[in-house]
Amino acid sequence: MMFQDSVAFEDVAVTFTQEEWALLDPSQKNLCRDVMQETFRNLASIGKKWKPQNIYVEYENLRRNLRIVGERLFESKEGHQHGEILTQVPDDMLKKTTTGVKSCESSVYGEVGSAHSSLNRHIRDDTGHKAYEYQEYGQKPYKCKYCKKPFNCLSSVQTHERAHSGRKLYVCEECGKTFISHSNLQRHRIMHRGDGPYKCKFCGKALMFLSLYLIHKRTHTGEKPYQCKQCGKAFSHSSSLRIHERTHTGEKPYKCNECGKAFHSSTCLHAHKRTHTGEKPYECKQCGKAFSSSHSFQIHERTHTGEKPYECKECGKAFKCPSSVRRHERTHSRKKPYECKHCGKVLSYLTSFQNHLGMHTGEISHKCKICGKAFYSPSSLQTHEKTHTGEKPYKCNQCGKAFNSSSSFRYHERTHTGEKPYECKQCGKAFRSASLLQTHGRTHTGEKPYACKECGKPFSNFSFFQIHERMHREEKPYECKGYGKTFSLPSLFHRHERTHTGGKTYECKQCGRSFNCSSSFRYHGRTHTGEKPYECKQCGKAFRSASQLQIHGRTHTGEKPYECKQCGKAFGSASHLQMHGRTHTGEKPYECKQCGKSFGCASRLQMHGRTHTGEKPYKCKQCGKAFGCPSNLRRHGRTHTGEKPYKCNQCGKVFRCSSQLQVHGRAHCIDTP
């Protein structure tokens, strides 16, 4: 018979994790083994002569024996540092309750609770001994029915299986969070207390357990002792390595009961379940924002404190979260650990890799509950959802501008600092973001990895590919609340919004002119510098922007992909189609504030505005004459070059500008009877 009030070994043992055990030298490990052998002999004797009245006497003997381990290590000169850590374990950590059945079956100890101890496992690993000369110890007869992981204790396998089923029996009284085991609940309660005997010398954080302290310390030291045999990637603790290994094997043992989706780890499953329940148990005390995971909550807190504990070893730059420092470090190493099995493409980031995979499989599993729009990755969905709520949690301290994603915020910060950390190895040009560098790189290679499934057209830029796809779907998800106008891109939507607010955040230092979007500002800057970085390979003509080069390219190919549905007329660019559409509708949305005159396009309004201001920013390099619009400068330039590109089909006469050809054409019409 099994004693109902028996004391299992794990109730009284001071156990070592793999990390803690690694700190001990061989003599200290032998000392631990000798003391723990004595402990087992005590347990065995209790098993033979078990009497309820002797429980507490024997329990005190066990406690005394276990404490000797710490004391002897502390006295050892060699183990002084490690002994100091061990003797920090407070007395109350050993005073665990003696009630409740916590025994496991063992062919050696019979009715006595077996020693399910991390220490014993590490003694076997490091010394090669069978645990305390008992051959049967170390067997793991209990296997998880979901993932087949072996355990040497029935209660352990039952606790583990709850991670798969999602059953959580232990509830935190303070915040209502639930856990699969009592030990996990106890560890969680410490978060509410905010105390612990192990204080980090780097950041002052106090931790309750030595194992947690050692793992936490690695976030500062950068130590990563667990390495993946397949790809060489290293991790700070073994559980992270196990989860990572599943990305190679494809194993996803944790399944959602509600939608059937499977995950690599139980934490991912629990975080996913909250997308069904809407639960966000972690609330920020400063701003009230709630989070579904403690990790996201901790990173958010740093936006208030300004703490950046993760530092790049190469350049010293600090970051709020480990994923950001890893992403940054790849800019130094150019490492791309994620390889696509479909096309062989290698990517630097897991999110980019997941997005890329979705393009091959067509799987778009993350759907917006408000508008039904689907996304390849959860991060893209989260960013999109903020367009509905209007939430912009990332605020620039310099100009006050707010953003709905941290990446947009980081990119914006560089407009103030001028930082361009991503440099092209071929031409030396620098960029503010890795994605811009990647897109630029394709101008050298000619690579166009994004192909439209409907018409087969390839693109070098993913955002251009998305814009093009919306042209087929006629999708315009971004709507102006004031006028009801819809847009296919958030950038176009935000640019339009500024026409209402009058917000112009980008000012030219040379002429004082301000712009409401960074691309217009950059394009304008080239009118001063004369820079034209985009050159046509067919005729050598250069342009200030990639879009201009693309539109020009169609004059060679004759391609006109934008067709008017009303009259069938086709155009080489979307803007020209849009402008043409207004000839049917009569719409003139751009109004001059000085005289009230309206125009069908922004550029016409801009040129008209110069008739009021007298501004003539386009200057002829040969004679110094200035003009209000670029077309007039081009026309004037032909008086110097003698170029006459407009030819009459009837008589062959040539002209400098299209208007002269049109006037001449009318003369033929009059002559015709």
Curated annotation (Swiss-Prot):
CDD domains: KRAB_A-box. One of its GO terms (cellular component) is nucleus. One of its GO terms (biological process) is regulation of transcription by RNA polymerase II. The keyword Repeat applies. Residues 7-85 form the KRAB domain. GO terms for molecular function: DNA-binding transcription factor activity, RNA polymerase II-specific; RNA polymerase II transcription regulatory region sequence-specific DNA binding; zinc ion binding. Its main location: nucleus. A zinc finger (C2H2-type) spans 142-164, 170-192, 198-220, 226-248, 254-276, 282-304, 310-332, 338-360, 366-388, 394-416, 422-444, 450-472, 478-500, 506-528, 534-556, 562-584, 590-612, 618-640, 646-668. It is found in: Nucleus. It comes from the Eukaryota. May be involved in transcriptional regulation. This is Zinc finger protein 433. It comes from Homo sapiens.
